[in-house]
A protein has these predicted regions:
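Hydrophobic alpha-helical transmembrane segments
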Residues: 1-90
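Catalytic, metal-anchored helix/loop core of enzyme active sites in primary metabolism
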Residues: 92-475
């Protein structure tokens, strides 16, 4: 058609006619390119990776108009640029929070305060009855849980005037995890106590906002396949894993060359073992950047927390252990990054505020406004990076060793650390004994390949007994 149009064109209208024809032809070519691009993107959705579990990792996008991934026609030249965005949701989202009185739990409730689209369906805590009562009166959950029945009985008497069901123990956690009124379970609970409720919630079809490291560290081989089977989302809440999640931006695992996991280095960065001989509890609880709970603050100082995060990264994003590189970044501005096979590095930056990854997980795939301090690049004096000192802080190296061995060894690493940190917080052992006890527990353990939940919990109990025995013998 276009060739015939050119032949019959006569000067002086020829230039105009040729121009019109060229525009028409260009439009046809652009349309063909758009169809091919849309087809390619749709084919990309079929890539089998962790996109089904980590929704931003191979997620489905939607356009401004029809099913076409390109935006509608406009007189503005920017309409030629492909525009993709996620659908926004304005409906009420109901959440249940395990560990509502802890650091992550209370910050999650701050996010709820600022977002009327979020509603609390249930809360659970350990023993902070007074704080739980305050939360119930403010957020009006249907169910509230306490770990001990004694604490639950106290809470029932305090909130007898309110229409809330108070439950206790593991049965209570399981009831909250599976309640039909909630859509998302926030696992902000500390320790391996979170494994069973997380599994139950996944089996009930709940999306998981994951802040409980122990769940994936000890049972990642159970959790991730189950999540894939049930088609639920695992949404990371830890700042580093959220940063990786955001930096992936839908890229499949095959395009990842390396994951750069940042660490602040803790309060003792740069110190020698000799300088750590007399560290007291108060010293270790002074984190330079983040406001966190007591145990995780100690873990950050020993770099064991980073070791646990390495294990999480492996399970969350389906990468090999050798693809995970820990980088000490004292300013905690770059929360983590992804290096791709073409050499490009994409990172997520921001102020050290846990509410940002919490809110991102709860509203994913939307981004919502959030009050708070913004990152001001003019005020940044410097951004520096260092290699972690794995000789002084060898708890991080032990994490790599435990994950390479696999099976029940990550459970040993986690349980030994939990018990050792507890002894340190009780002022029963020295600071440097924490990683030493972890190493001893790993050396004496006979690995169980592919352990089930019961074997994981039995391993935890046996490690606790071992650490207690070692401690008693050395008194």
């Amino acid at each position: 058609m276009y060739a015939h149009f050119f032949v019959e064109a006569a000067f002086p209208d020829q230039i105009i006619t040729w121009t019109i024809a060229f525009i028409c032809a260009a439009g046809a070519v652009m349309s063909m390119v758009g169809d091919l691009a849309a087809s390619a993107i749709k084919r990309n959705h079929n890539i089998k990776d962790y996109g089904k579990l980590i929704p931003g990792h191979g997620g489905i996008m939607d356009s401004d108009c029809t099913d076409d991934v390109f935006s509608c026609h406009s007189d503005d030249w920017t309409a030629l640029v492909p525009k993709v965005r996620y659908k926004e949701h304005s409906t009420m989202k109901k959440i249940a929070i395990l560990g509502s009185t802890g650091s992550i739990g209370t910050q999650t409730l701050e996010v709820v305060r600022n977002n009327p689209e979020l509603q609390v369906a249930a809360l659970a805590a350990g023993k902070s009855v007074e704080q739980m009562e305050q939360q119930i009166r403010e957020f009006h959950p249907l169910i509230a849980g306490m770990w001990s029945e004694e604490a639950a009985a106290d809470l029932r008497s305090r909130v007898a005037d309110l229409p809330v069901k108070v439950v206790s123990g593991m049965d209570g956690l399981l009831e909250i995890a599976t309640m039909p009124q909630s859509q998302v379970l926030v696992t902000a609970i500390v320790g391996m106590i979170g494994i069973r409720p997380t599994i139950a919630a996944i089996e009930a079809g709940k999306d998981i906002a994951l802040a409980n490291k122990e769940t994936l560290v000890t049972a990642g081989h159970i959790i991730m396949p189950l999540a894939a089977k049930m088609g639920v989302k695992i949404l990371p809440v830890d700042s580093e894993h959220s940063a990786i999640f955001q930096s992936l931006n839908g890229e499949p695992a095959g395009r990842i060359e390396k994951i750069l996991l940042t660490a602040s280095g803790g309060p003792f960065r740069g110190r020698t073992r000799e300088q750590l001989q007399n560290i007291q509890v108060e010293d270790a609880l002074k984190h330079p950047n983040w406001s966190m709970g007591r145990k995780i603050t100690i873990d950050s100082s020993t770099l064991v927390n980073k070791g646990l995060e390495v294990m999480e990264v492996k399970w969350l994003f389906g990468v090999d252990l050798d693809q995970i590189q820990v980088i000490v970044h004292p300013q905690s501005i770059i929360h983590s990054a992804v290096q791709y096979v073409d050499g490009a590095v994409i990172a997520q930056l921001g102020t050290p505020d846990m509410k940002l990854p919490i809110q991102y997980a709860l509203f994913y795939p939307d981004r919502r406004p959030m009050p708070g301090k913004r990152l001001d690049f003019y005020e940044l004096a410097q951004i520096t990076f260092e290699k972690p000192d794995m000789e002084t802080f060898f708890g991080l190296k032990l994490a790599y060793d435990a994950q390479r061995i696999g099976g029940s060894m990550p459970t040993v690493y986690n349980a030994a650390n939990e018990k050792a940190v507890g002894l340190f917080l009780d002022r029963k052992i020295a600071y440097l004994q924490i990683p030493e006890l972890i190493r001893e527990a790993m050396e004496q353990h006979k690995v169980i390949e592919n352990p089930n939940v019961e074997e994981i919990l039995e391993t935890e109990a046996s490690v606790y007994d071992f650490i207690e025995k070692v401690y008693s013998e050395r008194q």
